[in-house]
From Swiss-Prot:
This is Anti-sigma F factor. Its EC number is 2.7.11.1. One of its GO terms (molecular function) is ATP binding. One of its GO terms (biological process) is asexual sporulation. Belongs to the anti-sigma-factor family. InterPro entries: Anti-sigma-factor_SerPK (IPR050267), Anti-sigma_F (IPR010194), HATPase_C_sf (IPR036890). HAMAP family: Anti_sigma_F. PANTHER family: ANTI-SIGMA-F FACTOR RSBW (PTHR35526:SF3), ANTI-SIGMA-F FACTOR RSBW-RELATED (PTHR35526). NCBIfam families: spIIAB. The lineage of its organism: Bacteria, Bacillati, Bacillota, Bacilli, Bacillales. It comes from Priestia megaterium. Keywords: ATP-binding, Kinase, Nucleotide-binding, Serine/threonine-protein kinase, Sporulation, Transferase. It catalyses: L-seryl-[protein] + ATP = O-phospho-L-seryl-[protein] + ADP + H(+); L-threonyl-[protein] + ATP = O-phospho-L-threonyl-[protein] + ADP + H(+).
Amino acid sequence: MKNQMNLQFSALSQNESFARVTVASFITQLDPTMDELTEIKTVVSEAVTNAIIHGYESNSDGVVYISVTLHEDGVVELMIRDEGIGIDNVDEAKQPLYTTKPDLERSGMGFTIMENFMDEIRVESTVLEGTTLYLKKHLTNSKALCN
């Protein structure tokens, strides 16, 4: 059995925390460890922030889309998508410390964090059409300390 949730919201920075908490709440039914939950929340935060800041260039008319699929075997699949400006060179964008917004004091570590916290990450992007992140994490059999 699998369970799925879809979410969409305006590309406003204040909605980043909404996305993070909503995804975390949905995932708790798999009883992840606190570390796993924190890692997934961090990844959602990074991906949504990238969509808002880079994809839509802080244009609040954009929409961020998230799909979460939970599998009975403890696999969590995330899809986070924007219809923004896209990424011209994904390999370059994934390099640690690379940022297109140094004036906004962006660290350029978003993709690095996502790659370290998730088991699989795939990025599809088309210039002027947007970017989609596909992320997968295999949860351990451990139980969370609290739900």
